[in-house]
Amino acid sequence: MCGRTACTLAPDDVRKACTYRDKQGGRKWPNWRDGDSDKYQPSYNKSPQSNSPVLLSLKHFQKDADSSERVLAAMRWGLIPSWFNEPDPSKMQYKTNNCRSDTMTEKALYKASLFKGKRCVVLADGFYEWQRQNSEKQPYYIYFPQIKAEKSPAEQDITDWNGQRLLTMAGLFDCWEPPNGGETLYSYTVITVDSSKTMNWIHDRMPAILDGDEAVRKWLDFGEVPTKDALKLIHPIENITYHPVSTVVNNSRNNTPECMAAIILTQKKGPALSASSKKMLDWLQNKSPKKEESHSIQSPKLSQFGAPPKKTSAGLMQQWLKKEDGEPSPKRAKK
């Protein structure tokens, strides 16, 4: 599951971190939807019902746009379906911050968004997950490995981004019109899958992470990539890393660098951190997220540890994909 994230980049840096190639091969930065850059507030500790930066096809807002063009929007975390008829979205009785991949083709909460092509990419520095240890829970911060490609000045492009690589999580969104009138609310849910071997010792679920711009392109381009093909992108990945963090992150009101700073666990809980992790801790203690300030957080790559449990089954989504591809569904053995 995914119930807490960090997104600390200033709005303009979010744009730069989302650089992509258009159909002509040129590199571009997506623009923010009008007014949305002001709705997004950088934070070390984002929880459901807050606004997060979301990447989606521009065609959702401009019908004459190409579906491959991208735009940034600030959306509420926790999907409110268009058919919800209460005047207050906080009255929503279901938790919709996460959407299980194995049931989203069946559940009324999500299948309309899925089959109408309302696919989005939720952006974050990383997310937090809690590993249960007897009666206690140890939080971990999980993110993409930060590997910088060295380029000569001649190879540099104005659109090149040299900061951290943002985590790109597959999501679904919807737009809700208040029954008594008012501003349209855009909201999203993060799709989750069975955890990969890299992190299933921490938790048995993880976000569906899109690793690389080609995966992001296919997920966003609903005009060119049909649902059944897009769903093939929804699976666990191993290309992530993590480190333990302080329990200060447990309280969503805490919004300080300490939330995502690496800590040293006792030998019973895990290995000591490397010198680079300690350096990161010192760096974070002198930083705070500011909208007017451009900065990035360099995260250390740590070794994985802990014995992973067995994976669970893929579920209904894989059965649906096989049916769409003309493959026979597996029959249950007779008892």
Curated annotation (Swiss-Prot):
Formation and reversal of DNA-protein cross-link depends on DNA context. Catalyzes formation of the thiazolidine linkage in presence of abasic sites in single-stranded DNA. Mediates the reversal of the thiazolidine cross-link in presence of double stranded DNA. Ubiquitination of the hmces DNA-protein cross-link by rfwd3 may promotes its degradation. GO terms for biological process: DNA damage response; positive regulation of isotype switching; protein-DNA covalent cross-linking repair; proteolysis. Gene3D superfamilies: SOS response associated peptidase-like. Residues 24-39, 321-335 have a biased composition (Basic and acidic residues). The keyword DNA damage applies. It is found in: Chromosome. The modification Thiazolidine linkage to a ring-opened DNA abasic site is found at residue 2. The keyword DNA damage applies. Keywords: Autocatalytic cleavage, Chromosome, Covalent protein-DNA linkage, DNA damage, DNA-binding, Hydrolase, Lyase, Protease, Ubl conjugation. Transmembrane segments: none annotated. Its EC number is 4.-.-.-, 3.4.-.-. It comes from the Eukaryota. Pfam families: SRAP (PF02586). The active site is at 2 (nucleophile), 129. The record marks 203 as: Required to stabilize abasic sites. Disulfide bonds: none annotated. The record marks 129 as: Required for sensing abasic sites. InterPro entries: SRAP, SRAP-like. One of its GO terms (molecular function) is single-stranded DNA binding. GO terms for cellular component: replication fork. Belongs to the SOS response-associated peptidase family. The N-terminal catalytic Cys-2 residue forms a thiazolidine linkage to a ring-opened DNA abasic site. Glu-129 catalyzes reversal of the thiazolidine linkage; self-reversal is favoured by duplex DNA formation. Glu-129 is also involved in sensing abasic sites in single-stranded DNA (ssDNA). His-203 stabilizes the abasic sites by forming a hydrogen bond with the O4' hydroxyl group. This is Abasic site processing protein HMCES. It comes from Xenopus tropicalis. The gene is hmces.
